[in-house]
Curated annotation (Swiss-Prot):
Residues 125-141 have a biased composition (Basic and acidic residues). Belongs to the dysbindin family. The gene is DBNDD1. It holds the Pfam family Dysbindin. Residues 1-38, 96-158 are annotated as: Disordered. This is Dysbindin domain-containing protein 1. Coiled coil: none annotated. GO terms for biological process: regulation of signal transduction. InterPro entries: Dysbindin (IPR007531). GO terms for cellular component: cytoplasm. Keywords: Phosphoprotein. The modification Phosphoserine is found at S95, S119. It comes from Bos taurus (Bovine).
Amino acid sequence: MEPSEGASPGGLVKEVDMPQAALSAPVPVTGTSGQSPMAEEELGIPIPAPGLLQVTERRQPLSSVSSLEVHFDLLDLTELTDMSDQELAEVFADSDDENVASDSHAGLHPLPRAGCLRSPSWTRTRAEQNREKQPFGDPERQPAIVDTILTVERPKED
C-alpha cells in the first residue's frame, strides 16, 4: 500500500482485518508490513490477539421494568398504606368498580356497594392492645374489633 498524505514521515499506514466476531471494521495500524506483532508492541502500538476479542456469547437485553407485571394482594397492600387518606381509599374503590363493570353486561350499571378495607396495622395494634387490657367477657370488646375495619362508601354514578 502507498503511504497516505496524513501519515507520519517514515511510517506506513496499513489496514489489518480482524475476524468479524472480534471487530466490526478494519483497524488502521501504523508500522511497516515486515514487522511482527511483537515488534509493533515495542513501538508502543499493541495489536490485540484475535482470541482475546472474540465474543463467545451474546445475551438478550433485560426486560424493562414497565413490562413486568406485579400483582399485590389487596389486603397486604392496605396494611402498608394509610387508609385514612381519602384519595387512596377512592383508588381502591375505583379499582373494584372497574372489575364489576367489566363483568357486567352492556347497558346495565352495577349497583354501588360499600366496601370494607382493613385498616393499617398501626391502628389494629392499638385496638388489640386495648382488647388485651379488657377481660374477655367485657361487652365493650366488640366495638374495639369494629374500629379496625374501615367502611368506604362508593360514590353513586348517575
